[in-house]
Regions:
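Canonical Rossmann dinucleotide-binding motif of NAD(H)/NADP(H)-dependent dehydrogenases/reductases
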Residues: 3-36
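Residue(s) in the substrate-gating loop at a strand-loop-helix junction
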Residues: 152
Length: 263
């Protein structure tokens, strides 16, 4: 009955060139969605779209800098022009905490104006732009639709990385507020909240390749004892985007190996 969870749906996925976004694009397409892959890194993004097409799926690749409202609007417009409508947007693009020249995470007071502006522009404004563009299109179609955002467990509890956590905390609350506001229009809004995760940019997207001993130590901090893989949050995003979650809105789903269970 649920072999293809998004059969015939049209979806936009930001940050689709790597990590969770890439895995989500492949999964959504595997489950029948027609996907607009939207990423600022054109070569990686084209590769994702090519993989979908090679597997028999439908995909469009667009360059999208989520800090530019026009780019986000254009990604939604491409879904409509290519596939006739928009059913799902997965606002996944994001960046991690700013780093020092030595490769460590900057403390809160070390963050420059440029660091602050970059995190707010990508992690907050980029998601806001995606939500706004999707809502406008959903209303043109008569209502109904799904918004999924990538937040983080860093936005759900206090533990270092205050600047990054603040940007993700904004998205945590955004889902709750929008879910209440948009529920009468049958528009669902939910977040997937990864914990420590290995991506193309190292652990947690920090751009630092950690030795195995450090990875093992981080894994031990999680009750399930292992680091999150990008496909795992992508699978939760697939569920939230599908009709299996028809009566689920306004929630933040931790994919963290059990870390939040102890908070």
């Amino acid at each position: 009955m649920y072999a293809r969870l998004l059969d015939g749906k049209s979806a936009v996925i930001t940050g689709s060139g790597s990590g969770v976004g890439k895995q989500a694009a492949l999964l959504f397409a595997e489950h029948g969605a027609r996907v607009v892959c939207a990423d600022v890194r054109e070569d990686w993004n084209e590769e994702t779209a090519a993989q979908i097409r090679a597997a028999g799926g439908e995909a469009e690749a667009v360059r999208c800098d989520v800090t530019r409202r026009a780019d986000v609007d254009a990604a939604v417009a491409r879904a409509v022009s290519a596939f006739g409508r928009l059913d799902v947007i997965f606002n996944n693009a994001g960046v991690a905490s700013p780093m020092t020249p030595e490769g460590g995470m900057k403390s809160f007071v070390e963050a420059s104006d440029e660091d602050i502006d970059r995190l707010l522009a990508i992690n907050v404004k980029g998601v806001l732009y995606g939500c706004q563009a999707a809502i406008v299109q959903f209303r043109k179609q008569g209502g109904g639709g799904v918004i999924v955002n990538t937040a983080s467990v860093a936005g759900m509890f206090g533990w270092g990385g205050a600047l990054y956590g603040a940007t993700k905390g904004a998205i945590v609350n955004l889902a709750r507020r929008l879910a209440v506001e948009l529920g009468p229009e049958n528009i669902r809004v939910n977040n997937v909240c990864p914990g420590s995760m290995v991506t193309n940019f190292g652990i947690g997207g920090l751009g630092v390749e950690l030795p195995q001993a450090a990875l093992d130590g981080m894994a031990k901090l999680q009750p399930l004892g292992r680091i999150i893989e990008p496909r795992e949050p992508a699978q939760v995003a697939l569920f939230l985007a599908s009709d299996l979650a028809l009566n689920i809105t306004g929630i933040n789903v931790p994919v963290d190996g059990g870390v939040m269970a102890g908070k």
